[in-house]
Amino acid sequence: MRLARSGAALVLACAGSAAVAVDVSQLDYGCERGAQVAAIYISDTDPALAILQIEGRQVVFQNVPSGSGARYAEDPAREIGYIWWTKGDEAFLTWHAEDGQETDLLRDCRITPTE
């Protein structure tokens, strides 16, 4: 996997409509316990999106307000499910349950250099 394709254009074509160019970048993270996470960021949308492969499925996150860094929520309206936080070259993943419990799933994630 490549570290970043900043400025790359992804062309989405829908039947019966014009193609749309979207700014897409991919960053690979190395986390605690040797976990690897590939995150795809789509910044031209409102809200911006992040897509991660978690527990065998693709999860789409929407950018939500944060005090510092970038915060992406799986279910931004209810603030439950997966939450992906990034700041600089660091990131972490948490789970927010309906009862308000918050569980850290991945900590100490850092962007990994390309080989």
Residue ranges of each PLM-predicted region?
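Bacterial N-terminal signal peptides that target proteins for export
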Residues: 1-8
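N-terminal signal peptide c-region/cleavage motif recognized by signal peptidases
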Residues: 14-18
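Absolute protein N-terminus
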Residues: 1, 21-22
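Cysteine-centric segments in proteins
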Residues: 22-115
